[in-house]
Structure formats: structure tokens, C-alpha cells
Amino acid sequence: MGPVARSLAGLVLVTATMIVTTSVASASESAAGPAQPSIISAAVYALAHPTASPPGSNDFSCRPTAAHPRPVVLSNGTGANAYDDWAGLSGVLKRDGYCVFAPNLGGPEGGMFQAIGDIPTVAGQFGQYVDKVLAATGASKVDIVGHSQGGMMPRYYLKFLGGAAKVGTLVGLAPSNHGTNLDGLVDAVRSLPGGGDFADGVVGAVCPACVQQEVGSSFLTNLNSGGDTMSGVNYTVVATRTDEVVTPYTSAYLTGSTVTNHRLQDYCLVDGTEHINITYDHIAIQLVRNALDPAHAWTPNCLT
């Protein structure tokens, strides 16, 4: 099955699955689930525990330390949830000494699939959650680590909702910063008779965020106009050459003096990690840790 066919199959599956649960709300988090080695095992667990918190996260009694004064807020990708995206990284950051938080936003309350709603609306919910974290922890700023849409959506919060004053670092893992053509699927679908109506009417109704992440969408044009970054915020992007969702993979990259762009294969040429599993890749995880704590950064490779 070629990349376009794989993308089309995935789109049909996700659309068919989500169409029965279209109301968008801020989903609650429950007790922490176990650590997981991959998105596959995490998703299997999340089927029965869709509101599980990633290990070590969502402890509102946590107080930041002098070594790690900014809490870390994790932001998941389209159709994922906090647990299945972050059941690996969350525990790592907690053991490093961070206060870690991971909300479920932009999906049906208690549902498996989150981050499908209108992105500006979800960004507003995200901002409210950041305020909750700041109030609980006493911190003045947070750091954000996001995957896919979750690495791009906070930029709306930073640019339009006052978030730049409350964020120190934004790390994006395969973020959809400049959109995706889904290996040509977007153009292929829209070129079909009725394809535009299907994309905007059916997919857009079930998953507004999906349409908003198309290359050239009005949402992304607005987000990226006037530059990619905000003053006072440090940005790190980790992309993978084998990304099959954010395509071309270079559309993840940002430009600006406070940006550091990475590619997994520059650290391990044979790293085949793709879009979905990048949050579990050991190189990506270390690059996140480096971005959050540059004073103790070290260079990962194929083995470490």
C-alpha cells in the first residue's frame, strides 16, 4: 500500500470512528496509567481507559523546584489523547524533577479521540488550563511540549491569546506548523468530483482541526503571517524524514533567531521512527530534555 493509499485508509477509518461522537468539550483526566513503550501499546490501554493520565502527570499538588521552575504542559496530536501520546515521555520528565501536566482538550468528554475541534477554540481551552497550572503551582511560566497539532496549536495561544508572556519554551515533535498535504492525499481528494464538499462538509464537521491543518488553509495563513515566533519564547522542533502525516516533513520547521530545528536522522541515520510514534523515540525524548534543560544537554545517537 502506497503512502497516499495509507493516508486515505487512515482518514476514512478515523472519520468513520469519530463521526458518532462529534460534540467537542474539555475532557477530564483520571488516575495515571502505566508507562508504555510505544503508541501502539498506549492506544490499546487507552481504549479501555480513555481518560487515564500519563504516568507522573496531573498532580496539582506538585511544586516546581529551583532546578526546574517551570511546569511542563504536554499537548497531544489530532485524534490522540493525553495518555496514548505521552505515556512514555511524561514519566521521564517527572523523574527528571518536573511538574508535568497533560490535559485532554478538543474532543468529546471522556472520549478516546481528542484534539479534533476548532483549533482557536481549543487554544483558548489550553490557555485556561495553563492558567490553572500556574495558579496551582505558583509558577510564573510553563514550558510546552506538543506533538503534531499539539506542537502547532500552542503557537495560536502564544500569538493571539496572550500566551507568550506565560511560556518559556515550546517544543514541537513533528508539529504541523505549516500544514500538510498528506503525501498528496489532500489534493487528490479535493480534485475528485465532490471531493471539496467531502473534505469541508464531512471531514470538517467531524474534525475541524483536520481541515485547518491543510497546507494553505486560512487558519494557517493567519497563524503564520508576520513570522513564526513570538519574542521571549524559545522554540525547538524535532522532525523525522519518515513522517507520513506532516508532509513534507520540512513543513514542521520554524524560522527565527530563537528556533532550533532538529531531524532525527541527523542523530541516527537509520532511525525509521515516523509521525505517530515520535513521542516514544529515544532520540526525540532526549532532544526534548535538552530543550527544557539546555545546561545539562547531551547529544543522543542510535544507541543512547
Regions found by a protein language model. Give the residues of each.
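Conserved beta-strand scaffold positions in the cores of enzyme catalytic domains, especially
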Residues: 72, 100-102, 170, 235-237, ...
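Extracellular/periplasmic catalytic domains that process cell-envelope and extracellular macromolecules
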Residues: 64-68, 94-95, 136-137, 145-146, ...
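Extracellular secreted precursors and ectodomains with disulfide-bonded cysteine-rich loops/domains
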Residues: 60, 205-208, 266, 300
